[in-house]
A protein has these predicted regions:
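Conserved, well-structured core domains of diverse proteins
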Residues: 1-49, 53-56, 61-70, 76-116, ...
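Alpha/beta enzyme core
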Residues: 46, 67-69, 89-211
Length: 211
């Protein structure tokens, strides 16, 4: 006889306050506009809406094709600050707040590193940087799009927590978390220790491998 499960919806609450998010335990991982096509972005986001789970934007920012899908979205912020950057590549609070406060954006994920290329940045080659991608990311069309290996906004755990608090405030108190791969366990330990000492925490942590 199958066991009785009190809650078969398999969801967990992330964040606190009115903008906390009741998140499914199964979601769509980061899939950038630019890495995959507009129809693929919209189809995945529509699936998120139908299935009542979330779709992570990947580092390519929130595009009109995500919005067309209408599904719950996790906006990933990478070292390139795509969608929330100034012309010189620095983080822009005003541009961030404009997108982060959209109803469809449920959580913010700061990408520190990823398992596919731990410790490295990335590049979208110039031929792939179309007008739409350039407008979405806030970059120049037809030029190589560079994701630096590290963030300008922080370089240690204390600065990271300060940045998390900043994004939380700018987004209207939406959940803000981090994504990283565990190249060296002490890196995560130092972040956790800093949170414990400060009594200030990220809302979630995405672990992307242990490379």
């Amino acid at each position: 006889t199958p066991s009785s499960i009190a809650n078969s919806d398999f969801r967990t609450k992330v964040g606190i306050g009115k903008n906390s998010y009741n998140m499914s335990v199964l979601n769509i991982s980061g899939t950038s506009f630019g890495a995959i096509s507009p129809p693929a972005i919209t189809s995945l986001n529509k699936a998120a809406k139908l299935g009542k789970f979330a779709h992570n934007t990947g580092e390519g920012s929130m595009s009109k094709y995500h919005e067309k899908g209408g599904g719950d979205t996790i906006w990933q912020i990478s070292s390139g600050y795509f969608g929330c950057r100034k012309k010189n590549g620095d983080f822009c609070p005003q541009n961030f707040s404009k997108i982060a406060k959209k109803e469809q954006v449920k959580m913010i994920e700061i990408k520190i590193s990823q398992g596919a290329k731990p410790g490295h940045g990335g590049m979208l080659l110039a031929p792939k940087v179309t007008k739409e991608i350039a407008e979405t990311r806030g970059i120049s069309m037809g030029k190589d799009c560079i994701s630096p290996a590290k963030h300008k906004e922080f370089s240690n755990p204390n600065q990271l927590i300060d940045f998390v608090k900043k994004l939380r405030k700018l987004s209207g108190n939406k959940p803000v978390g981090i994504k990283m791969c565990i190249g060296h366990p002490w890196e995560l330990v130092s972040i956790v220790k800093t949170m414990f000492l400060r009594k200030e925490y990220v809302d979630f942590i995405t672990i992307d491998g242990a490379e």
